[in-house]
Amino acid sequence: MKQSKLFMPTLREVPSDAEAISHQLLLRAGFMRQNAAGIYSYLPLAKRVLSKIETIIRQEMEGAGAQELLMPAIQPAELWEETGRWDIYGPELMRLTDRHDRRFALGATHEELITSIVRDELNSYKKLPVNLFQIQMKYRDERRPRFGLLRGREFIMKDAYSFHSTQESLEEEYQNMFDAYTKIFTRVGLEFRPVVADSGAIGGSGTHEFHALAAIGEDTIVYSDQSDYAANLEMAESVDQYTKQDKAPEALEEVHTGDAKTIEAVSSVLGLPEQESIKTVVFKTEQGLVMALVRGDHEVNDIKLKNYLGALDIMMATDEEIEQALHSTPGTLGPIGADMKIVADYAVRALTNSVCGANKSETHYVHVDPSRDFEAEYTDLRFVEEGDVSPDGQGHVKFARGIEVGQVFKLGTRYSEGMNATFLDEGGKAQPLIMGCYGIGVSRTMSAVVEQHYDERGIIWPKAIAPFDVHLIAVNGKNAEQLEVAETVYRELTAAGFSVLFDDRKERAGVKFADADLIGLPVRINVGKKAPDGIVELKARRGGEAEEIQQADLLEAVRSLYEGLQ
């Protein structure tokens, strides 16, 4: 490809609204342009990268036995109503109505649609298992699109769905997809970590996320410093290692705490450490209000609470709902005398002579003994903290930031039961299809790669997904001898199977070199002043100095350099 013909509108300045490095560089290097908040056009360079990522995905998915199909982006509301997700999914689901007042959704996921397709077709255990995948645009009306492709409203995704007759078959396919994802993310050049995660709005009973490690990542990864344990912060387990405090419980007593309404303020008023207090938070689920308790220096993990309750959704109760139920407001809430379900973290059970709200204005209880003063169900309910004991007993946990680029789910019968998708087992009895679901953010993966592969001059593409293999530069595009040598090199490299971007523009050398660094192709060849002597410069984009090479030896030198690159 000759660069004089390539549509590649580069920018010299960093766009003011671009926070993430990948957002800045992909805009500056002419890979994409923004059309609206969270909506982008992929220009030719980006399309080449995306196509290579998609090719790797197709190779590994098909190699793992999956079959590609393509489903519509517009989905009938009735399908989402069958599973209840039309109401549950919330405002992120983009909805529309056609001229006949029929309701539709722009696909955020395709569980309902794929289930509607197979429920009349996969009607016997003899036709199972099956794994179907597609690569397609997805849509989510993000409240605050940010970081370019890392959180957009329209994005490219690979989603796959497997159907099984037994749980054992699902487990096998889950591991099959886990292994395929490991190969995919390794091939595209990502440093990543698979972590235990929450299934969120998708549902199901087991899931792993694949995170690309990056400082800009919105997710916190918890990992052991001495083992392979890793989990999303929401799912990282806190070990029940607490023993009851060795002190005699004193009589429960009400005390006036004035306008102190935070754990920090109340602890200061009473002259007690925060870990001697009980933090109370009230949540609302479809089951009603529930009170969550953690130690004062800990934070309630609402995902753990949701999973413990088996709730479909969970949110913090409003002040009005709390006032109606407890005749009090946040800041003085507590479990004593509360007429609602109470779930507490293990650390609370170990407290003696602690502090909690009295459900009265400006009043708290002191000398609270959980085993004596209220009843609660105990479970792991808090967010872990750095330095906690690793759940597997090996070492302690540390935190890192990650970008979620993929996720695998064990859906079970969550969708098949709701949509009456059944098959006949060996005994002729109807059973719900057992499902798995497997997603990869294709456009997000491109952005995540940039977050890991760049320097102060621009992008450094891993060779597997670079838009071109080689950047060939005629340093002086007005010099006939340089252009002639460059043309010869261009033909030789192309004939040898390399994809080459040939900068034949009549621009200054500094502009060409800056653009080359910004675009970040793996190998660069400069055809300059020594071209008449049959000498060119060869260098790798990732580090390394330019090396003078005889033109006759160039092809072999390029092969050798390219093979040694990541």
From Swiss-Prot:
A GO term, aspect molecular function: ATP binding
Localization of this protein: Cytoplasm
Record-linked Pfam families: HGTP_anticodon, tRNA-synt_2b, tRNA_edit
Enzyme class: ligase
Swiss-Prot/TrEMBL GO biological process terms: prolyl-tRNA aminoacylation
GO cellular component: cytosol
Gene3D superfamilies in alphabetical order: Anticodon-binding domain, Bira Bifunctional Protein, Domain 2
PROSITE patterns in the cross-refs: AA_TRNA_LIGASE_II
Enzyme Commission (EC) number: 6.1.1.15
Keywords annotated in UniProt: Aminoacyl-tRNA synthetase, ATP-binding, Cytoplasm, Ligase, Nucleotide-binding, Protein biosynthesis
Highest taxon above the source species: Bacteria
UniProt-listed SUPFAM superfamilies: Class II aaRS ABD-related, Class II aaRS and biotin synthetases, YbaK/ProRS associated domain
Signal peptide residue numbers: none
Reactions this protein catalyses: tRNA(Pro) + L-proline + ATP = L-prolyl-tRNA(Pro) + AMP + diphosphate
Its biological purpose: Catalyzes the attachment of proline to tRNA(Pro) in a two-step reaction: proline is first activated by ATP to form Pro-AMP and then transferred to the acceptor end of tRNA(Pro). As ProRS can inadvertently accommodate and process non-cognate amino acids such as alanine and cysteine, to avoid such errors it has two additional distinct editing activities against alanine. One activity is designated as 'pretransfer' editing and involves the tRNA(Pro)-independent hydrolysis of activated Ala-AMP.
Quaternary structure and partners: Homodimer.
Family note: Belongs to the class-II aminoacyl-tRNA synthetase family. ProS type 1 subfamily.
Domain commentary: Consists of three domains: the N-terminal catalytic domain, the editing domain and the C-terminal anticodon-binding domain.
NCBIfam families assigned to the protein according to its UniProt record, in alphabetical order: PRK09194.1, proS_fam_II
Name of protein: Proline--tRNA ligase
Lineage: Bacteria, Bacillati, Bacillota, Bacilli, Bacillales
